[in-house]
């Protein structure tokens, strides 16, 4: 179905490298580059009336930010493993990666149990790890008096290269998109003091997550 949709999009002059083709919807990653005008949308609906086209500005921001990491992390025809569950972050990660099956010709291989990973022939593992995960981990280390380090600095596991496409994406963006789309998924709940502190600080300090992440990067580079 996805290949059929991609071919038809090409036929009506829509660049499918800038849209995510999901089960029952198409999500625009970049409206300008995709050239998915309202007129082309109407033409598309004549062929695929059951597939909804979504132009979420939140998802376009997510895709644009994630692309900065993916440009450096992905190579043509990479085989990328992705953990499949009902989590909102994992579903967002799949939506972000899906266009790269056409941009770079990557293959996405989904798995349900971490024990399966050892049996997979893949080049990279894309982890559903976002900006709030990193910042909350930094705060936990600070509160415990531990050395400051970035979880996303871990780049390999059992000879598999690890990548973090959503590392600069806040949790709020992810939940805003999945919520507005009505995507059935579970939130990555994290309890404790650190998440509450991040929320508290964000009400006073603009872009506090990004600033904490950059500070940790600076410390790492200047050790």
PLM region spans:
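RNA-binding accessory domains that recognize and position tRNA/RNA substrates
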Residues: 1-107
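Mid-to-C-terminal catalytic subdomains of enzymes
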Residues: 3-9, 13-17, 169-217
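Proline- and acidic/polar-enriched loop/turn elements at helix boundaries
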Residues: 81, 113, 189-190
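Active-site adenylate/phosphate-handling loop in enzymes that bind or generate adenylated species
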Residues: 98-173, 177
């Amino acid at each position: 179905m996805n290949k059929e949709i991609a071919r038809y999009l090409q036929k009506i002059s829509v660049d499918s490298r800038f849209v995510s083709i999901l089960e029952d919807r198409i999500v625009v990653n970049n409206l300008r580059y995709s050239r998915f005008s309202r007129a082309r949308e109407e033409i598309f609906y004549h062929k695929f009336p059951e597939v909804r086209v979504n132009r979420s500005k939140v998802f376009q921001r997510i895709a644009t930010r994630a692309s900065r990491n993916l440009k450096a992390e992905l190579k043509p025809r990479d085989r990328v493993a992705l953990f499949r569950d009902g989590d909102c972050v994992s579903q967002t990660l799949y939506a972000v990666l899906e266009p790269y099956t056409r941009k770079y010709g990557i293959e996405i291989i989904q798995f349900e149990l971490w024990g399966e990973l050892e049996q997979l022939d893949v080049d990279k593992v894309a982890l559903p790890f976002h900006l709030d995960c990193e910042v909350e981990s930094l705060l936990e280390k600070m509160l415990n008096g531990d050395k400051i380090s970035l979880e996303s600095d871990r780049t390999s596991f059992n000879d598999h290269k690890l990548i973090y496409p959503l590392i600069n994406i806040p949790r709020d963006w992810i939940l805003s998109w999945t919520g507005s789309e009505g995507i059935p998924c579970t939130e990555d709940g994290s309890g404790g003091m650190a998440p509450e502190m991040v929320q508290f600080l964000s009400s006073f300090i603009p872009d506090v997550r990004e600033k904490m992440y950059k500070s940790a990067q600076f410390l790492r580079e200047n050790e």
